[in-house]
A protein has these predicted regions:
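N-terminal and secondary-structure boundary signal
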Residues: 2-339
């Protein structure tokens, strides 16, 4: 990560700024004592605290994970040809959605909607996967379902093109777009991630969190699955983490303790990820993996869905070595079923 010093000059406030401009040029309300070098508040930048201002500790996310079961599987693998039936089979094998969601829960589902791509290209969470998971969550008694992501491309365009906004409208789910006031500073004692702006708004209401991600190739870190999915919660100039991509992805297993993760491997983007662009890059694998250990789920996804050697996936080994999950997924209690 760059160590260059930021400009200490205050950014000019405008009547209307975009979300990304806001995160880069966040202003401070309140007076500064001109020329004295003193300030009443510190300036928050997305990648660092500005020198000369008092450093303030950011928030820490709550742990949404449930206590591990000694008798129920921690991972389930389902194979089938129908999206909803395969999702349901995976969740039934895991003990049912009722194991994770109780009546009255507010459930935040984090899909991967980074790009404005249609579902057929497998670069984003498939609308059929979202529909299936949301149905199960509502059937389990959730009072509200929030869908949220911070896409690279236009949020409205990404949710529309991916088909997820249509599902949200159809099922009366709350679709929460990132706005300038949706972000808060996050503090984490990560290998790379220390202090950063974070899409915190959906977590203010959530009592349970589910990660729902596609399984796809990624040109920088080999793959994007359940761990990499949390990258979409960061604000600011997050592309500067690309030079430490495996470290930042392993940090997400420290940052996020979700209730459940679901890896959609019905159609896998085998090459030219993360954006894709050709139907020939997509291979039907007809598999859904659900579990409580992101590291284990991704280890299965990399070897059995992307069909690659796990030895090359550095972020999995980093997370495993840090005790954030188990890359040896067969060591866990798991169940494999046919939908």
């Amino acid at each position: 990560m760059s160590t260059s010093k930021p400009d200490n000059a205050l950014p000019r406030l405008e009547a209307s700024v975009s979300r990304r401009e806001f995160l880069v040029r966040l202003g401070v309300t309140g007076a500064l004592i001109a020329g004295s070098g003193l300030a009443t508040r510190r300036l928050w930048q997305p990648d660092h605290f500005v020198p000369g201002f008092q450093e303030e500790k950011g928030l820490q996310l709550k742990n949404y994970a449930l206590e591990a079961s000694k008798v129920l599987p921690s991972m389930a693998i389902a194979h089938g040809l129908d999206h909803e039936k395969t999702v349901r089979a995976a969740m039934a094998a895991l003990g049912g959605m009722g194991r994770f969601i109780q009546k009255g829960d507010v459930v935040m589902i984090k899909p991967n909607v980074a790009f404005d791509r249609p579902p057929a290209l497998a670069a984003t969470t498939h609308p059929d996967a979202l529909r299936a998971v949301a149905k199960l969550v509502l059937e389990a008694g959730a009072s509200k379902v929030i869908i949220a992501d911070n896409p690279i491309n236009s949020p409205t365009g990404c949710f529309f093109k991916s088909g997820l906004s249509a599902v949200a409208s159809e099922m009366n789910l709350e679709l929460m777009y990132p706005e300038s006031n949706s972000f808060s500073p996050l503090s984490l004692n990560g290998e790379i991630l220390k202090n950063w702006t974070f899409f915190h708004q959906p977590f203010k209401q959530a009592t349970k969190v589910i990660g729902l991600s596609p399984c796809k190739d990624h040109n920088l870190c080999h793959s994007s699955m359940t761990m990499k999915n949390w990258y979409g919660l960061l604000g600011g100039r997050r592309n500067q983490f690309h030079q430490h991509i495996h470290s930042i992805v392993s940090d997400f297993a420290l940052m996020m303790k979700p209730t459940l993760v679901i890896l959609d491997g019905m159609n896998v983007l085998m090459s030219n990820g993360p954006t894709g662009g050709r139907l020939s890059d997509v291979k039907p694998m007809n598999t859904v993996v659900a579990g409580t250990d992101m590291v284990a789920v991704d280890a299965y996804g990399y070897t059995h869905l992307l069909e690659r050697d796990l030895a090359e996936l550095t972020y999995i080994h980093k997370a495993h070595d840090r005790g954030l999950g188990n890359k040896n997924w067969k060591d866990a209690l798991y169940k494999e079923v046919q939908a």
